């Protein structure tokens, strides 16, 4: 009799995805982030579900319901802060995961890469709408500012904004629909993750050398399951330390003030994980131009497979490209810092320079450096 693991129609799928999956023997810890993202998604759905049991999506009671969760619900404070800080962990891992893909040339798996970019957009949309739900000052004004950006779309912009708001301003209708979307999107994301994995398993994983590893594969279980468990353990230690000691470290104090449409906070800014994109948006003095730059700053990821001009897939043996990669990382950190600063000198200039460098590095410097490396290697 054949093993049930290999014959049962459902268990067979799990077996081929997580147990008997042939994996390259040399993938490093940079390949841990995929599984960590999966764990994060599961954690967010679970904590989110329990929060939704006590939350009310109404402008008059939303803020109070979050307070009620933290004060009166058994371990409500823990669930709330795990959910809020879990989102931060999610984005840290997302950025590491994407960075790994760029460094090692994983974007040459075009189907996997493009669905991954769409996943990033879906997660960003979910996080944005989740930030609106507590209905604090930054929730309300963040929602107002970001949704208002759509009014820059020629001809149909203003109508589109009012359609999204469900009225003439961010109000009860907006909060209710944002809650509905925030609840449904993670399940759509889960389906997209399955498609992401389906495409990945068509080709198999990349590896640090960027070479074909068919001649040297090992089973996913037990080698990479145990490695992933270590990653999850380290993640949980980090997350729980954050939740237990400094739960508000990454949040905004303004969000502890209930939403007030008559009082604008001095500095409107999104959560830290959107600051780089926010800095790019702010660095262009034209509304439509800013919105286009913001959109393109994320969608530029889809151009990586087209812009790849090196004869080698990975950056492991390309020191010049490695330098550019780390310049790009430093540039994004500068953008993140600038995004959290007030709009005044010298931050405006720094933001504009960093935004320009971001696009220039990806669109011009990286492809041309790769071509030069080909020449240097006489390829």
Swiss-Prot record:
User: Needs which cofactor?
Assistant: heme b
SUPFAM superfamilies per record:
a domain/subunit of cytochrome bc1 complex (Ubiquinol-cytochrome c reductase), Transmembrane di-heme cytochromes
- Supply the source organism for this entry: Ctenomys goodfellowi (Goodfellow's tuco-tuco)
| Primary location class | mitochondrion
Q: What does this protein do?
A: Component of the ubiquinol-cytochrome c reductase complex (complex III or cytochrome b-c1 complex) that is part of the mitochondrial respiratory chain. The b-c1 complex mediates electron transfer from ubiquinol to cytochrome c. Contributes to the generation of a proton gradient across the mitochondrial membrane that is then used for ATP synthesis.
The similarity annotation says: Belongs to the cytochrome b family.
Which UniProt keywords are listed? Electron transport, Heme, Iron, Membrane, Metal-binding, Mitochondrion, Mitochondrion inner membrane, Respiratory chain, Transmembrane, Transmembrane helix, Transport, Ubiquinone
Q: Which CDD domains match?
A: cytochrome_b_C, Cytochrome_b_N
Q: What is the effect of changing residue 156 to I?
A: In strain: Isolate NK 13030
Give a yes or no for keyword Transport in this entry.
Answer: yes
Q: What is this protein called?
A: Cytochrome b
Name the residues that bind heme b b566.
97, 196
A GO cellular component entry from the record? mitochondrial inner membrane
Enumerate the subcellular locations listed in this protein's record, separating them with semicolons. Mitochondrion inner membrane
The membrane spanning regions, by residue number, are: 33-53, 77-98, 113-133, 178-198, 226-246, 288-308, 320-340, 347-367
Q: What else is known?
A: Heme 1 (or BL or b562) is low-potential and absorbs at about 562 nm, and heme 2 (or BH or b566) is high-potential and absorbs at about 566 nm.
User: What molecular function terms (GO) are annotated for this protein?
Assistant: metal ion binding; ubiquinol-cytochrome-c reductase activity
PROSITE patterns, per the entry: CYTB_CTER, CYTB_NTER
Name the positions where heme b b562 binds.
83, 182
Give the bilayer topology. Multi-pass membrane protein
Binding-site residues, a ubiquinone: 201
Taxonomic lineage of the native organism: Eukaryota, Metazoa, Chordata, Craniata, Vertebrata
């Amino acid at each position: 009799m054949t093993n049930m693991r290999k014959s049962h129609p459902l268990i067979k799928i799990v077996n081929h995805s997580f147990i008997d999956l042939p994996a390259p023997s040399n993938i490093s810890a940079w390949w841990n982030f995929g599984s960590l993202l999966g764990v994060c998604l599961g954690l967010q759905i679970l904590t989110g579900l329990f929060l939704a049991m006590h939350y009310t999506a109404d402008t008059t009671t939303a803020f109070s319901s979050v307070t009620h969760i933290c004060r009166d619900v058994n371990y409500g404070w823990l669930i709330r802060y795990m959910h809020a800080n879990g989102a931060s962990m999610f984005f840290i891992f997302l950025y590491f995961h994407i960075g790994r893909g760029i460094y090692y040339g994983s974007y040459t798996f075009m189907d996997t890469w493009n669905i991954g970019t769409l996943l990033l957009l879906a997660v960003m949309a979910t996080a944005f709408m989740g930030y609106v739900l507590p209905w604090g000052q930054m929730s309300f004004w963040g929602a107002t500012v970001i949704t208002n950006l759509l009014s820059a779309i020629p001809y149909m912009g203003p109508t589109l904004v009012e359609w999204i708001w469900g009225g003439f301003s961010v109000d009860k209708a907006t909060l209710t629909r944002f809650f509905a979307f925030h609840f449904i999107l993670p399940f759509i994301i889960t389906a997209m993750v399955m498609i992401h994995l389906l495409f990945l398993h068509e080709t198999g994983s990349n590896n640090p050398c960027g070479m074909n590893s068919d001649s040297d594969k090992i089973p996913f279980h037990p080698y990479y399951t145990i490695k992933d468990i270590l990653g999850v353990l380290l993640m949980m230690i980090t997350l729980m330390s954050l939740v237990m000691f400094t739960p508000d470290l990454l949040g905004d104090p303004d969000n502890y003030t209930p939403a007030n449409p008559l009082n604008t906070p001095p500095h409107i800014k999104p959560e830290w994980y959107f600051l780089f994109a926010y800095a790019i948006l702010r660095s262009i003095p034209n509304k439509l131009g800013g919105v286009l730059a913001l959109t393109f700053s994320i969608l530029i990821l889809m151009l990586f497979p087209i812009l790849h001009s090196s004869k080698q897939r990975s950056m492991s043996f390309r020191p010049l490209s490695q330098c550019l990669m780390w310049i790009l990382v430093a540039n994004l950190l500068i953008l993140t810092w600038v995004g959290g600063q007030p709009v005044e000198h010298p931050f405006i200039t720094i933001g504009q320079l960093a935004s320009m460098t971001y696009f220039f590095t990806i669109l011009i410097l990286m492809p041309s450096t790769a071509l030069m490396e080909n020449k240097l290697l006489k390829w």
